[in-house]
Amino acid sequence: SSAASDVYKRQLVCLTALSAHAQWKWLNPLECGFPVIQNQGWTEEIGDRYVRLPQRAEGKVRKPVWDLSRNSAGLAIHFFSNAPELKVRYQVSGPLNMPHMPTTGVSGVDIYSIDSDGQWRFYFGGYPSGDTLQYHYTNIGKDIYHDRGYEFRLYLPPYNTIKWLEIGVPENDELTFIPVSPEKPILLYGTSIAQGACASRPGMTWGTILQRSLGYPLINLGFSGNGRLEKEVLDFICEIDARLYILDCLPNLTPKSKDEITQLVSDAVKQIRATHSSPILLVEHAGYSNALADDTKLQDYVRMNEGAKKAFEELQAQGIKDIYYLTREELGLHPDAWVDYVHPSDWGMETQANAVERKVREILRIPKGDLSTTMPVTQRREPNNYEWQKRHRDILSLNQSNPPRRVILGNSITHFWGGEPKGPSVRGMETWEKIMRPAGFHNLGYGFDRIENVLWRVYHGELDGYKAEEVVLMIGTNNIGINNDNEIVEGIRFLLSAIRQRQPEAKIK
């Protein structure tokens, strides 16, 4: 009958829908058993929520700051997957967009992959809409070295609060979350510009661009309209042991006089310096797009920058060390690099990120050259043998708990010799136990490493926190056939300079 036929059709549609649903498995990052929210700070307190200040900050910081701290600006989830496509679905609690900023920028997410040679790829997953926002990323290729897929970085909404989030993969594919990085972060305290206005998507906020370029965790404490160098916020900032503090608050200090700005900047630096010796970078106001047409805007940013520069010079005269200054001219934003009068577009964000990166590389002594052998990158060429990132975490932990007298940096030839951290296989345990262990060696070899991978590891702490008597370097074999002789020699020269800066008293072999 016709009625029976209709029932059958409805059942078929239902079964088809169920079948399609069953083809995907959904994973909640917060349920994987260990902290995975990158770039957060206070992980032990808030590692189960996509927020930026701990609960105890409520009532201590002003309500607008507290409310904005519920936004997920700068936060990210890192994972490995071999899936040919990915989905992300989530809900947020605030408005999806603003008059000067689209839904993709306010409430969207971004996904990038990193292949086994450390190269990044951006994926487009559609446009989010509705109560449950969803992205679908397709055409994810295969890695040329193995079938274990890529590393992925999922960047979260800069201007909204996530209620829940899940990542989907086809049911026969794998997804493995990556634990929170143990490395010291960079901490950025700023305004709406730091929070992300008006980037078109999360990956294009200048703090996130900087984080991708440097590879260090970056805690984004940008608060729209509320980056005011307040003591109460700085109290929480001082709880974070950062490798660098960036203060970029001048655009929210417009009502202040020059002398008031000088005092605020000076007090902020002294408050941080009272508990931390890490470098502090002061960033000038980048200016306004319409400053040439509106003289009051010109006077505003000139006054603020003069006040900040005066504070910087006075602090230097007082003998406060490791403070640095980035000028408006060094930032170099073009008048067309803003969405409105003060909030940068993607172009402006990239311009600012590049300017800050140049200064940060100078401060932290992490230069990057023009040759591939002088550009620090990660790798993941042998995940069926060992996980490169896990070995890095293990080495940092071992060096901290048991500082070595000597280290050997290299590739698989040294990795699988013996010693700690233990590799997946050992081919020279007898000689290691007889010669290397009594000499106090730690094995810093990684299978399939190239010069540029060792450079990344040196920049990311494997020679920090101890004084070695000897550093043995054996690298370059895996660059043969990829790089010419000059590139290999220059890469080794570049690497040796980085080693010497971190271990000035060690004998290098």
Label every PLM stretch briefly:
Residues 22, 100-102, 110, 142-148, ...:
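Serine-esterase "nucleophile elbow" of acetyl-processing enzymes
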Residues 70, 226, 230-369, 426-440, ...:
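Alpha-helical cap/lid subdomain in secreted, periplasmic
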Residues 23-70:
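Glycan-recognition and processing domains
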Residues 1-8:
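Short, small-residue-biased leader/transition segments that mark boundaries at the very start
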Residues 66-178, 383-384:
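Extended, charged alpha/beta regions that create polyanion-binding interfaces
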Residues 50-86, 93-95, 421-433:
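Active-site-flanking structural segment that lines cofactor/substrate pockets
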Residues 128-139, 147-148, 164, 182, ...:
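A charged, solvent-exposed segment within the mature domains of Sec-exported extracytoplasmic proteins
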